[in-house]
Amino acid sequence: VAINERSAAPVQRDQAMMVKIDQLRRVMDLYPSTLWAKRAQVLAGVLLIDREPAEAVKLLRAAQSDMPVLDDYLRLWIGESLLRLNEPIQAAELLETIPTAVRDSNLIARAAYRTGEAWYLANVCFRAVEWAERALGLADKDPAAPLALWHQADCHTRENRFPEARATLKQLWLRYPHSPEARDAKARLDTVLEGESWAPTAEDHYLRAQAFLGLAMQGEAVEELRRFLALAPAHPRRSEARLKLGVAYVRLKQYDQARETFRGLVADRVQESSEATVWLARVYLRQNQGDKLIELTRSAAQGSLGGDQRAMVHLFAGVWLEDQGRFDDAISMFRQVATLGNSASQRAEGLWRVGWVQYRTARYRESAETFRAIVELQVNGFEPQAIYWAARADEREQKTGAAEQYARVCQRHTYSYYCQLASGRASLPLIVPAITVVESPVREDGERLPENRRPEIERHPVYQRGLELKTLGFSQDAARELASLTEQYSRDQDVLLAFSTLLSEVGAYYPALRVAKIHFREKLERSGIPTASALWTVAYPAGLLPTIVAQGVKAVDPYLAAAIIREESQYDEKAISVVGAVGLMQLMPATANAVAQRYGFPTVGREELFDQETNIRLGVRYLGQLLDQYGGNLAHAVAAYNAGPMAVNNWIAMHRGRDQDEFVELIPYQETRLYVKRVLRSYGEYRRLHNGTS
């Protein structure tokens, strides 16, 4: 029985709900003593919480003796039903029992918030305040936190505890600045509470700015940081705030303001000056102020910068020199990067840049030697591209052996972007992952567990709850339970694979994919490591493909959209980037609304973009626009999805006639360059895993 019907109209949802409830009642009547009748009773009870709460209470209470594994959930659902019946005291007293009745419950924080809410509705303020404080201590980032603080403040006001009310309202305004309750809190604070007026301090503005930065709301953070700096000319955290302000300006692409902020920090020679120097170099590069960037490399050599920081400044200078066509000077600068860097990755980056400039200026023999020197460094992440481009350089020189080098890429890094390129150039056979076992089409949940751990795990109450919730169709609740077990069994890969498979099956793609990326990276990227087929299903989720296909955008291969979701958000529908892109396909609100307007959809707010269907509807259409704009060229369209069409148009004009693999390496923005490689790699893997179909 499906619970979620968000896409249907209200009348249709209502009719569908009645049909489901009737079906569940038939199961209960026809098979009264079976487990399925007990499950039907639970489902019917949950479905009736809003419609017929009295009947819901009756059904859910009867289920308590039949389904003890769900005791904490049943208590929560009964409590919700009692609140609908305007019985807040009964609800609160029941909700209070959850932590003691089910000590390993994953609902304790949620129950604490609902308990506080129930006591507030019952006008028992001292209990409401107590439970709100407990809930905030357990999970202060819960969406219910702002309302809990608002109720706390209201209770303090009712009982004439005005200092406590003021402190709580202030906490609400500072820590949850984006919430509707924060606006109400500010309005309440602006009134005189018991003869005292209130005005935010400099410290208040700084704390509020940090909260906005945590939400990637850069514009709002800038306003608060500027207020802080205006009010606190001698504050000990002033330099720290200026650095945060400069970075926020960069995120907002306000480079003039960022430049002046960083220049001031560098001149002041404070603790933040070194980091500000690197940021200033980045801004000089973005603004094409090469002379100042070169000058900065000289002053950086005499300052207090660390080796990697000096290397970064020289790297930006080298990129500018390369952009100006001063290739010999660029090579010299990149060699300094390789010398200055403390970390192996920074040294490899410098050498890679040297080799790439040599390649793009047709010094193929020299570039091949440089790329092979990188391979010898054995720095993670650089080997496949160095082997590939050494082979490309040899190919340009018409040397024999390039095919063997392409094969070497795929032997060592089978599932990499560079193996995909190498396969295309050398006509290598399609590589199929090595599978440890041949799985039957359908396996019971418990059969996925390794034999030596199965009895122990099957007895675990959290595992039992997770499976029962999965069976009932409560996917989010099942995911919560199963995800909590991945931490407990983090050292047992067989168990983790079983849990991640179950998570993926209930639609919890983000935690499942996270497990795969953290614990199975080698198996997913290198050849010769036996890999269970279930791991590929977890690592490349296909559950949203029907939603993507349903958009009917013919220009978009659904696997390409899935690859973008995988790399943009890792299937986390609540993801927010540092620049404020939102949701599964990481849409900027302005871009989303431009697409909505073009296709006749209603305007959308930032919060609506967290809805997966809304995000996919707009994201797939935007991707389709870009594919049409660039004549189906994947690299151009994917780059534009990340960096914007204006930047990509400039790059196309600069590098017209280049092969696609060369164009990708020539993308000047490192973030975009790496992004394009990741998306194209994931796209290739999706197509390979689905037998090349689209």
Question: Each predicted region: which residue ranges?
Answer:
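Acidic, polar-rich low-complexity tracts and alpha-helical solenoid repeat scaffolds
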Residues: V1-V579, M585, Q597-R598, G624, ...
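Catalytic and substrate-binding regions of cell-wall glycan-acting enzymes that process beta-1,4-linked
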Residues: Q405-H413, L503, L584, G632, ...
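Acidic/histidine metal-binding catalytic segments
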Residues: V556-A563, Y630-V638
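Short glycine- and hydrophobic/aromatic-rich loop-to-beta-strand nucleating segment
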Residues: M585-L587, I616
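Active-site substrate-binding loop specific to GH73 endo-beta-N-acetylglucosaminidase modules
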Residues: A594
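A short, structured beta-strand-centered segment in the mid-to-C-terminal lobe
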Residues: V604-T614
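Histidine- and acidic-residue-rich, metal-dependent catalytic cores
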Residues: G619
